[in-house]
Amino acid sequence: MDDDPVQGEDAAMAEVIPLPEGASSGSGRSPATRIILDTVAGSTDEPIVGPAGDAPPTDQVVAVPRLARHEIVLADDHRVGVAVCGQGLPVVLVHGFTAEGILYAQTLSRLVAMGFKVVAIDVAGHGATQGLPTGGDDLESYTRLLARVLDELGIRRAVFAGHSMGGRLVAQLAAADPDRAIAVVLIDAVVGECWDRLIRLSRFAPPVMIGLAALLVADTLSTLPLLRNPSQAAKLGRLVGPVLVGHARRPWRMFGPAISMMRSEPSRRILEDLGEAGIPVVVIHGDRDMPVPYATAVDAARRSAGTLVTVKGGTHSWVLKDPETLPAIIAELLDGPLARVRAAALGAAGLRADAPPTQVERAFLGPHAWVRRLTPPLELRTGAARHHRSRYEWTVSEPA
């Protein structure tokens, strides 16, 4: 592999831990799994929980989620970066092309307060995850790695959320193994007829893909709200900075995922399989997304029989620009379509709708799930709420 191992001070603070004898991860596989606990990456001077809210300071004690970063080593010695926080219904997030899971820390920390256990996984060749041995010649290779990570973490069922390329991966994962998915949330995902046409065109005209990549870079650079909210820009910059440095040091890591997207099969069958399997799908998309046009989402929702959420004025990376909008959308859906999904999942597990997070989590994780070991405790701090209102507005369209 071309990725550097943990070095220097970080390496001195890493620990390799074997699974207990006789224990297995959720599916009974890989008893030899090893976990490197990266205590440096999992701790910062201040939790990144977003901009301070408008409420005045108080003496109220509030729980502050901290997304802990770890590097796990699978049974075949493949290193994978994961970030974990919270307790409750598992939500697995897969990031977009050139990103990594920790960039979504602010949004994920808000989901924790809603009763979710969030797990962000770095895709092969991104973040702390090694590239694939073959260079990742097709997207199925990335999906198979995700499935192995879930098995070895002990996550049996989850809500799968994916942004951009991550949306394609979680859709493909759920379509191939519907029993894993409680629901699928596609966020400006590269699935749908419009995107498929762009991919077909790029095979004959490579500059098309170069243009799409340029649009993605421009959208990412516009993510930092320097003038609108300098404090938020500084916090987000703490997350984005190391990612950009990593790309500058090893730019070749992006070649594999880019080529894999160009070689990917049309997403039509994947979306239709989700609908035929009865997997609840929510398609959330910005109506000003230039790299992945909004028409892509309309087609994806139609083919998967999913709920379409239109983020007004949202560009491709709106979910990074405003950490409040996605949790607000999920909160609204939990009073609507997702309420039925959650109740059905809990009922199938023999739980009541008001079951405590510990029971909910236990129902969807394996008995020796290592993801529990990776989960940090909530911090209790004195102060006011630290959230603004969501920057974007949206509309929700139920399937016909």
List where the protein language model places each region.
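Conserved HGGG/HGGXW glycine-rich cap/lid loop of the alpha/beta-hydrolase fold
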Residues: 78-128
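Active-site loop/oxyanion-hole signature of alpha/beta-hydrolase fold enzymes
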Residues: 120-161
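Conserved alpha/beta-hydrolase catalytic His-Asp/Glu region
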Residues: 196-197, 215-276
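Catalytic histidine-centered segment of alpha/beta-hydrolase-like enzymes
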Residues: 314-327
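Alpha/beta-hydrolase fold catalytic core
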Residues: 1-91, 113-116, 155-156, 264, ...
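Acidic catalytic loop of the alpha/beta-hydrolase fold
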Residues: 288-292, 316-317
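Short beta-strand/loop motif that positions the catalytic acidic residue
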Residues: 277, 283-285
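Flexible "cap/lid" loop of the alpha/beta hydrolase fold
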Residues: 175, 184-215
